[in-house]
């Protein structure tokens, strides 16, 4: 060994030692942050905030907690600010669990399946709920703003470069994601990987595997950023933990009480007199049925169900009813609407998941806020009962 080589050896050793120490420190910090996220789950689980929706740290913490039921949905989980709303009603775990909503206005199934794929094995055996808006399944061209506004580069990257989903499922998901190019602007690595996945060609598959190390590095960087943001949220914005207290809920009595519309609900319930001139019954059935037949929401729901089955999650699929009274006045008959109520459970039950679509409330004006896919206090009482049944292993009631 030459003299210059001997002189370099201590520097090389010192450099390696510094790298090892840095790795140990990062690993320790990572474990501490995860412990903090789990320790504060009682406070963060019932809350709705952007970081929970965009990141994965708080979703993982909820998935690890045996006393928390995650629910994925859209703006129906955010309103109204009534005590019956799920995350408020279950805030103190009156029946033994808290509800943890992950939601954003316009969030849809293509958004949720990316989160499911990103969480992967964390969801194995975990009970969770999915809340669907029926309107998505009745239009051939749903809006794109909900998807673009809720798109999470972190969840998408982790799903694409993670190992939870098989290549065929990733290929089908990639084909749908590429239909929203605006979400992939300035995300060249993710877009390139999605195009390789979607093509299905052997060469592109080999290129994708060559990209895998770079994708995993990107995912790790996203994860570190997410944990530090979670730390900031816990230190600055987390509310004091609620006092958990179990109590006996008389669901029949609660629902009976809420079935009598409260004054606070009066302005939210659509009355027939407020509709425009009634259109001939059934005159718009063909257009409605065409929407139900061709809506891409069915593709996204199937992809979501495939993801849930692949990671071995245990989901409950909930769907609000259609605003039947509105559709009656809009010229869409009940027999046409029944096609949605037939098609939804038929698809979900292929995966052996429980589904509740509240079909019997199709023409109940007190179930939805006006005719929109948002629940009144009465609607939430029914949702709450189904969630409680499901968490405790009972058959969910509609």
Residue ranges: model-predicted function:
Residues 272-275, 283-287, 321-335:
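Active-site His/acidic residue clusters
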Residues 76-172:
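Membrane-embedded segments
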Residues 38-39, 151-310:
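Secreted/periplasmic serine-hydrolase-like ester/acetyl group-modifying domain
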Residues 371-398:
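Histidine-centered active-site loop/cap adjacent to the catalytic His
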Residues 11-31:
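Hydrophobic membrane-insertion alpha-helices, especially the h-region
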Residues 33-97, 114-118:
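Membrane/wall-proximal cationic-aromatic binding patches
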Residues 1-10:
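N-terminal Lys/Arg-rich, disordered targeting/topogenic segments
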Residues 219, 325-357:
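Substrate-gating cap/lid alpha-helix
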């Amino acid at each position: 060994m030459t003299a210059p080589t001997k002189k370099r050896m201590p520097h090389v050793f010192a450099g390696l030692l510094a790298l090892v120490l840095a790795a140990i420190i990062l690993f320790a910090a990572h474990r501490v942050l995860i412990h903090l996220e789990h320790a504060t789950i009682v406070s963060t689980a019932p809350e709705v905030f952007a970081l929970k929706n965009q990141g994965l740290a708080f979703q993982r913490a909820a998935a690890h907690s045996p006393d928390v039921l995650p629910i994925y949905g859209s703006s129906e989980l955010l309103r109204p600010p009534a005590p019956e709303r799920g995350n408020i009603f279950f805030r103190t775990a009156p029946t033994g669990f808290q509800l943890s909503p992950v939601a954003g206005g316009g969030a849809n199934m293509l958004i949720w399946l990316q989160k499911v794929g990103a969480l992967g094995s964390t969801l194995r055996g975990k009970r969770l709920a999915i809340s669907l808006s029926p309107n998505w399944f009745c239009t051939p061209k749903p809006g794109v703003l909900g998807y673009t506004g809720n798109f999470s580069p972190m969840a998408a990257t982790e799903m694409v470069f993670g190992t939870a989903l098989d290549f065929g499922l990733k290929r089908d998901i990639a084909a749908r994601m590429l239909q929203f190019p605006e979400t992939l602007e300035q995300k060249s690595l993710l877009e390139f990987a999605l195009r390789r996945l979607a093509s299905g060609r052997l060469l592109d598959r080999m290129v994708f595997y060559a990209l895998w190390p770079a994708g995993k590095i990107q995912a790790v960087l996203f994860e570190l950023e997410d944990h530090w943001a979670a730390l900031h949220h816990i230190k600055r914005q987390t509310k004091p933990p609620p006092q958990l207290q179990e109590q006996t809920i008389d669901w029949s009595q609660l629902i009976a009480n809420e079935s009598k519309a409260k004054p606070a609900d009066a302005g939210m319930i659509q009355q027939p007199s407020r509709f425009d001139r009634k259109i001939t019954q059934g005159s718009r059935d063909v257009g409605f049925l065409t929407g139900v037949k061709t809506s891409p929401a069915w593709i996204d729901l199937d992809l979501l169900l495939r993801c849930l089955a692949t990671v071995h999650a245990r989901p409950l699929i909930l769907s609000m009813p259609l605003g039947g009274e509105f559709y009656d006045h809009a010229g869409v008959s009940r027999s046409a609407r029944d096609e949605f109520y037939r098609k939804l459970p038929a698809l979900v039950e292929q995966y052996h998941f429980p589904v509740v679509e509240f079909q019997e409330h199709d023409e109940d004006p007190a179930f939805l806020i006006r005719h929109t896919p948002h629940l009144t206090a009465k609607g939430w009482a029914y949702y709450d009962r189904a969630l409680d049944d499901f968490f405790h292993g009972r058959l969910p009631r509609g």
